[in-house]
């Protein structure tokens, strides 16, 4: 049985491809998700995707993943800098996760430099554009342990 990966995108990432393309590029979220699903399958893994602009919905999806996925790739968007609640949900389910950002948040406004997730993430991918999603999915598929099937 291959690994099961959950890809979560936070607020405004539904606007990928149209929102500030000079920062985020012109690839849409639908294109990113399709590419990541195909890449996961080529590695023998499965990928589920989820996007929400609402903190509570993201928390609910993380909690629903408990016992069902081997790893999470999360681009928390602006919640990176504000959400202790999403951090607590990730820690509460005990699923290893990769934190991902399309842009180099450390080269942007100073308030974007702090993350509530980085110190607990298994890895952080920053500034590689949408290619970072493929890197994250590949890392989870090849390096994370499969959950125990009881």
From Swiss-Prot:
Gene this chain is encoded by: qutE1
Biological or metabolic pathway of the protein: Aromatic compound metabolism; 3,4-dihydroxybenzoate biosynthesis; 3,4-dihydroxybenzoate from 3-dehydroquinate: step 1/2
Molecular function in Gene Ontology: 3-dehydroquinate dehydratase activity
Protein name: Catabolic 3-dehydroquinase 1
Annotated site location: Transition state stabilizer: 19
Function: Is involved in the catabolism of quinate. Allows the utilization of quinate as carbon source via the beta-ketoadipate pathway.
EC number of this enzyme: 4.2.1.10
Record field: catalytic activity: 3-dehydroquinate = 3-dehydroshikimate + H2O
A biological-process GO annotation: 3,4-dihydroxybenzoate biosynthetic process
Swiss-Prot/TrEMBL keywords: Lyase, Quinate metabolism
Active-site residues, record numbering mapped to chain: 24, 101
Family of the protein in this entry: Belongs to the type-II 3-dehydroquinase family.
Top EC category: lyase
Domain of life: Eukaryota
Binding site for substrate: 75, 81, 88, 102-103, 112
Lineage, uppermost ranks: Eukaryota, Fungi, Dikarya, Ascomycota, Pezizomycotina
Subunit structure, interactors included: Homododecamer. Adopts a ring-like structure, composed of an arrangement of two hexameric rings stacked on top of one another.
